[in-house]
């Protein structure tokens, strides 16, 4: 599996936030296995254990912009019970949150606020873009709406829909957990490589392409 290596590069020529450089590399732990089987397997076990704890204890930042936030909050009710994924502890401060859900329309005046709140979140941190407006501006193709929050912050998971259902938000959590389980992050700020390795997961569009092409009979809206 290929990984995207991200390193902070404040002196680089990148004019977009964040100031970093990226490159596609192979799994760094495989190199440790080739050098030393014992230490390589130990690194694998340590990363698996740390990633297991991270992905099963995701605390979302309580931050909503529009109607998509209503659907997000609905997933916290007993009907959907998002507590099964360890993501029911809403945080009112970005310094205590693990990931941010940008749910709704991002206006130009709100973009600096979102970026500053993202900067206040501690590493490791992730971002979910929820809804068509957050993904690409939606139906608001005007000067006052940002055409996608990935213009100023990195996004890990995109949720399509206007607005998405609570089940879509829960699926996004599961996809984020799957991605976190494959990450390779520094175990300490003084131990090992300080780069962040994120697995290049296959998109849901590509994964379901053959299944969708094979569909020949479409149900009417009243049959769904």
Curated annotation (Swiss-Prot):
Keywords in alphabetical order: 4Fe-4S, Cell inner membrane, Cell membrane, Iron, Iron-sulfur, Membrane, Metal-binding, NAD, Quinone, Translocase, Transport, Ubiquinone
Any one cellular-component term (Gene Ontology): respiratory chain complex I
Short name of one Pfam family: Oxidored_q6
Cofactor: [4Fe-4S] cluster
Membrane topology annotation: Peripheral membrane protein
Class in the EC hierarchy, top level: translocase
Cofactor binding: number and manner: Binds 1 [4Fe-4S] cluster.
GO MF, one example: NADH:ubiquinone reductase (non-electrogenic) activity
Assigned EC number: 7.1.1.-
Family: Belongs to the complex I 20 kDa subunit family.
Role noted for this protein: NDH-1 shuttles electrons from NADH, via FMN and iron-sulfur (Fe-S) centers, to quinones in the respiratory chain. The immediate electron acceptor for the enzyme in this species is believed to be ubiquinone. Couples the redox reaction to proton translocation (for every two electrons transferred, four hydrogen ions are translocated across the cytoplasmic membrane), and thus conserves the redox energy in a proton gradient.
Name of this protein: NADH-quinone oxidoreductase subunit B
Species for this entry: Edwardsiella ictaluri (strain 93-146)
Recorded name of the encoding gene: nuoB
């Amino acid at each position: 599996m290929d990984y995207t290596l991200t390193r902070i590069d404040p002196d680089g020529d990148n004019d977009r936030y964040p100031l970093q450089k990226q490159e596609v590399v192979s799994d760094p732990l495989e190199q440790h296995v080739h050098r030393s089987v014992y230490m390589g397997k130990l690194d694998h076990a340590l990363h698996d254990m740390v990633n297991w704890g991270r992905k099963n204890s995701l605390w979302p930042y309580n931050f909503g912009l529009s109607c998509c936030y209503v659907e997000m909050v609905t997933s916290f009710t007993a009907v959907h019970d998002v507590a099964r994924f360890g993501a029911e502890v809403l945080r009112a401060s970005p310094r205590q949150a693990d990931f941010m859900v940008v749910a709704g329309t991002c206006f130009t005046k709100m973009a600096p606020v979102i970026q500053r709140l993202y900067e206040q979140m501690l590493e490791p941190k992730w971002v979910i873009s929820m809804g068509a407006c957050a993904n690409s501006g939606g139906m608001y193709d005007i000067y006052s709406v940002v055409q996608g929050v990935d213009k100023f912050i990195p996004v890990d998971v995109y949720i399509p829909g206007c607005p998405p259902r609570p089940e879509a938000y829960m699926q996004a959590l599961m996809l984020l957990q799957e991605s976190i389980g494959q990450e390779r992050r520094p175990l300490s700020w003084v131990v090992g490589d300080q780069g962040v390795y994120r697995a290049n997961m296959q998109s849901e569009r590509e994964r379901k392409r053959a299944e969708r092409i094979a569909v020949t009979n479409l149900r009417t809206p009243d049959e769904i």
